[in-house]
């Protein structure tokens, strides 16, 4: 008998707790609750056919065995992925720290000041290195950033260009191939043509509205693009540049020679390669383009007492507000990796990063000179870290490959027979000597081992950086490990994460990220693998990916899986591109409309637009369900043009709609597909699934249902699962022989995250996963039962129960007292809780999802808190508290306010800070008072250098 299965540690509710909760809900058994919650016609008849669960110890041995199948050769392939050194102080205190990896996107400003500052450091570093005034706080990867640049520049076309139908982007042929593939996927549905050619032969024409360049280019050559950029601007063409962020420590930054957008990846700033991801893409642009910029932007603001603070700025651009009119569908990005990159810049500072870049460049210069002595011809006139060689007549690429592999080295091999390599931060003298030996042996030459490499540069004066960067004091003050550790800790104390308390965000599934699932990520065999190594060197990764894919097929009831999308939004986009490709293959490419319920998350319409579709909104009825009459009418009205329905199940209202099978049948009868948004899959696993219900494709959020962490806004993984007829259209990659529908730079997206979900499924097993779903539903219904008589529950299913989340009614409170759902959210911070989801999907409400991981004690404490806040609301209603000066409208109360000598409120300090006894045991002090949300938008200050003075 196995006694240490993960399920007993992951699920917070035991049998005794269950009995107590069921009595409160008013049902006799857990099965009765589930039977009354989920429609009988969609219940699975058999348990999921998954492997028996492993104990945590057994999984540790299993994952070690898989890791041992990965062969960690020294890899110099480059092409956007490079070995790097993650400072141990960052790995230990950020990457492996649950305070950082279990936090949510920093929408709740007052309990997010730590990671907001960390992300502001990232933005500042990006702006400094690129010499651009504005950067966002990460995108999914470099290739996605390129695609975002294309669509942003398309939106920024002049009126003349729009009238003329300008739709061509010139792309220099020396761009990374994976970047070109992802841009192509994005460009096609937008009607944008990518015209690939030599930048030196570029001739402006009216149909060209933008140009994209790589710096240094894909072969490693550093081109002087200043004249090209001037020529493009004279023709009203914008210029976007994919720039190696580390090279900009030595090279003239694109902002100094006129680039309009600079993008790329910050993987080289201390983030392991992880077999392709995750790492933080970056995106920088001009200030005048800020409202067209994709992704989240951190800016300065002040709290109500004038204290400087940070917040997420210009949110009205984003999909959760603008929906189909959003600048992008980007939602989850790469916050944790951006945080790490920002800390890397803080830890090393300007001189440290210059030293790292100079060392890389010096080794490259040395190898260039030495290999020329062996008879090789180096083709890059100017370079940073990458050399490309034409071989002597008597030497072949295959000879070099054989010798290199015998020394466990991977080089880059070009189609024309050239051989190259990219030097990185980990290249030391021993590695340099191995590289020398490979090329010397192939050429039949003698060579001498070297003891050191002289500091040299081959960069022309015109291309050499002369301007300082990272000049803010934050990049100078924390260069010892002691100071760095304390700085990181000082920031993490400002934030609420799962390490503090339950985060009950509806539609976000903030469940446990178990340590046993997280540990494999720190293994070098998973951290240090380049995504383009030969397949036989990545057998462990490939086996894990294959096993996980099979598990996800079983769980979803589908025939095919792609793990490539780097987020849920990317999954939506990928799934819609698959639908488009399928429809075109059967002569139905004219279908261009997506039907979306009004309750849908904003990413749905934003993704549909990005995938080249038009959206049609379907109404919801008074019970929160899809209005069947309106659905039938809209489906019939758009029958010939309808491509798909996008629907979340259970709905974003937290309800298992009884007509879901009929909904799928109506759509299929129109010749369209059903796209199921898997955001709420945590209420399906083991009990029903999208394939059985009748959907054709769904995406999953591994960072919700499948236990990978949110990381303060990423990394996420959004794999798509599809029915048999859609399998041929899944995203490709050059290593698969086809780049159709490619949506991320790496073949398996953020492969480094996959061991977490793999571990979750392998350790939970069928019974554990199914029980987790049941308990998630139990917990939501328990909270609903506890709070229904005070706040009230907005929507319930046909039999009176909610799904795995519920919407708390706050609109009547506002009508009667002026207290808003936002005031309640801010007051929760004084009790040590992160707010539930505000005003989504119903304005003036709070959506709560407790997940299966919380204990009854935590649920009861949350109920006590909510009921005490209800009492505080009643005090305002009954005029026992001042309507204009009470604990709710003044919340949250930072420590500096509580200890201030000038306490002028009509209530006591104790009522403000310690409203119930449990708060005394685990007090979380907010760092700032309520933040001014308009100030930071009126004057956007996106770097540490900003000032309101």
UniProtKB/Swiss-Prot annotation:
Gene3D superfamilies: Aspartate Aminotransferase, domain 1, Type I PLP-dependent aspartate aminotransferase-like (Major domain). This is Glycine dehydrogenase (decarboxylating). PANTHER family: GLYCINE DEHYDROGENASE (DECARBOXYLATING), MITOCHONDRIAL (PTHR11773:SF1), GLYCINE DEHYDROGENASE, DECARBOXYLATING (PTHR11773). It catalyses: N(6)-[(R)-lipoyl]-L-lysyl-[glycine-cleavage complex H protein] + glycine + H(+) = N(6)-[(R)-S(8)-aminomethyldihydrolipoyl]-L-lysyl-[glycine-cleavage complex H protein] + CO2. Its EC number is 1.4.4.2. The modification N6-(pyridoxal phosphate)lysine is found at residue 704. It holds the Pfam family GcvP2_C. One of its GO terms (molecular function) is pyridoxal phosphate binding. Keywords: Oxidoreductase, Pyridoxal phosphate. The glycine cleavage system is composed of four proteins: P, T, L and H. Belongs to the GcvP family.
């Amino acid at each position: 008998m196995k006694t240490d299965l993960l399920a007993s540690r992951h699920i917070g509710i035991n049998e005794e707790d269950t009995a107590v909760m069921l009595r409160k809900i008013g049902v006799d058994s857990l099965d009765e609750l589930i039977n009354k919650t989920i429609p009988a016609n969609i219940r699975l008849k058999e348990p999921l056919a998954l492997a028996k669960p492993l104990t945590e110890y057994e999984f540790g041995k299993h994952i070690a065995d898989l890791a041992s199948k990965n062969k960690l050769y020294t890899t110099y392939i480059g092409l956007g992925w490079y070995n790097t050194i993650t400072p141990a102080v960052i790995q230990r205190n950020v990457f492996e720290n649950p305070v950082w990896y279990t936090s949510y996107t920093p929408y709740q400003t007052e309990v997010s000041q730590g990671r907001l500052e960390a992300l502001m450091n990232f933005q500042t570093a990006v702006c400094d290195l690129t010499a651009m005034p504005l950067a966002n706080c990460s995108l999914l990867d470099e290739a996605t950033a390129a695609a975002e640049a294309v669509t942003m520049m398309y939106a920024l076309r002049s009126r003349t260009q729009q009238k003329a139908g300008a739709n061509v982007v010139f792309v220099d042929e020396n761009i990374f191939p994976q970047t070109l593939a992802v841009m192509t996927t994005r460009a096609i549905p937008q009607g944008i043509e990518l015209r690939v050619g030599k930048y030196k032969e570029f001739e402006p024409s009216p149909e060209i509205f933008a140009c994209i360049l790589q710096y240094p280019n894909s072969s490693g050559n550093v081109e002087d693009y200043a004249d090209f950029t001037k020529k493009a601007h004279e023709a009203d063409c914008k210029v976007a540049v994919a720039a190696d962020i580390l090279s900009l420590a030595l090279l003239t930054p694109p902002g100094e020679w006129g680039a309009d957008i600079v993008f790329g990846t910050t993987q080289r700033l201390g983030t392991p390669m992880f077999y392709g991801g995750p790492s933080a893409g970056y995106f920088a642009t001009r200030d005048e383009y800020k409202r067209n910029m994709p992704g989240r932007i951190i800016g300065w603001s002040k709290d109500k007492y004038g204290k400087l603070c940070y917040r997420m700025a210009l949110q009205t651009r984003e999909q959760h507000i603008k929906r189909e009119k959003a600048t992008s569908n980007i939602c989850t990005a790469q916050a944790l990796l951006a945080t790490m990159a920002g800390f890397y810049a803080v830890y090393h500072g300007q001189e440290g990063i210059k030293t790292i870049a100079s060392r890389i460049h010096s080794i490259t210069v040395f190898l260039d000179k030495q290999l020329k002595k062996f008879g090789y011809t180096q083709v890059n006139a100017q370079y940073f870290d990458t050399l490309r060689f034409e071989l002597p007549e008597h030497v072949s690429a295959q000879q070099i490959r054989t010798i290199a592999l015998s020394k466990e080295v991977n080089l880059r091999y070009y189609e024309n027979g050239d051989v190259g390599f990219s030097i990185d931060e980990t290249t030391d003298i021993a590695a340099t000597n191995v590289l020398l030996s490979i090329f010397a042996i192939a050429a039949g030459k003698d060579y001498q081992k070297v003891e050191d490499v002289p500091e040299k540069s081959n960069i022309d004066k015109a291309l050499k950086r002369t301007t300082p960067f990272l000049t803010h004091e934050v990049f100078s003050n924390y260069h010892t490990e002691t100071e760095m550790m304390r700085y990181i800790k000082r920031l993490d104390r400002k934030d609420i994460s799962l390490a503090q308390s339950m985060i009950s965000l509806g539609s976000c599934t903030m469940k446990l990220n178990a340590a046993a699932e997280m540990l494999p990520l720190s293994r070098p065999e998973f951290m240090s693998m380049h995504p383009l190594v030969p397949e036989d060197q990545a057998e462990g990764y490939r086996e894990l990916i294959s096993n996980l894919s099979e598990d996800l097929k079983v769980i979803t009831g589908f025939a095919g899986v792609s793990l490539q999308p780097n987020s849920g939004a990317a999954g939506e986009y990928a799934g819609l591109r698959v639908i488009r490709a399928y429809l075109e293959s059967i002569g139905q490419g004219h279908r261009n409309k997506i039907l979306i319920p009004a309750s849908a998350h904003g990413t749905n319409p934003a993704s549909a637009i990005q995938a080249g579709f038009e959206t049609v909104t379907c109404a919801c009825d008074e019970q929160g369900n899809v209005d069947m009459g309106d659905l039938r009418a809209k489906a019939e009205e758009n029958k010939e043009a309808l491509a798909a329905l996008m629907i979340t199940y259970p709905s974003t209202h937290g309800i298992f709609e009884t007509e879901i099978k009929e909904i799928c049948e109506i759509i299929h009868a129109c010749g369209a597909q059903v796209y199921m948004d898997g955001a709420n899959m945590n209420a399906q696993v083991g009990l029903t699934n999208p394939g059985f219900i009748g959907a054709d494709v769904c995406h999953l959020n591994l960072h919700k249902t499948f236990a990978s962490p949110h990381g303060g806004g990423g990394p996420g993984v959004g794999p798509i699962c599809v029915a048999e007829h859609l399998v041929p259209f899944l995203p490709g990659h050059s290593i698969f022989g086809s780049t159709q529908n490619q949506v991320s730079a790496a073949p398996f997206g953020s492969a480094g995250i996959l061991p977490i979900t793999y571990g979750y499924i392998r350790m939970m097993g069928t019974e554990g996963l199914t029980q987790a779903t049941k308990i998630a539903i139990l917990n939501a219904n328990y909270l609903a039962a506890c709070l229904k008589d005070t706040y009230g529950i907005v929507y319930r299913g046909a039999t009176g129960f909610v799904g795995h989340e519920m919407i708390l009614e706050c609109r009547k409170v506002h009508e009667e007292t002026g207290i808003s759902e936002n005031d309640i959210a801010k007051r929760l911070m004084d009790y040590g809780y992160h707010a539930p989801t505000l005003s989504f999907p119903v304005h003036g409400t709070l959506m709560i999802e407790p997940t299966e991981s919380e204990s009854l004690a935590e649920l009861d404490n949350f109920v006590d808190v909510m009921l005490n806040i209800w009492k505080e609301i009643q005090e305002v209603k009954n005029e026992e508290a001042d309507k204009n000066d009470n604990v709710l409208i003044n919340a949250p109360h930072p420590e500096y306010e509580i200890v201030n000598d000038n306490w002028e409120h009509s209530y006591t300090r104790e009522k403000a800070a310690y409203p119930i006894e449990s708060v005394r045991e685990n007090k979380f002090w907010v760092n700032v008072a309520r933040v001014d949300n308009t100030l930071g938008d009126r004057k956007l200050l996106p770097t540490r250098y900003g000032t309101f003075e």
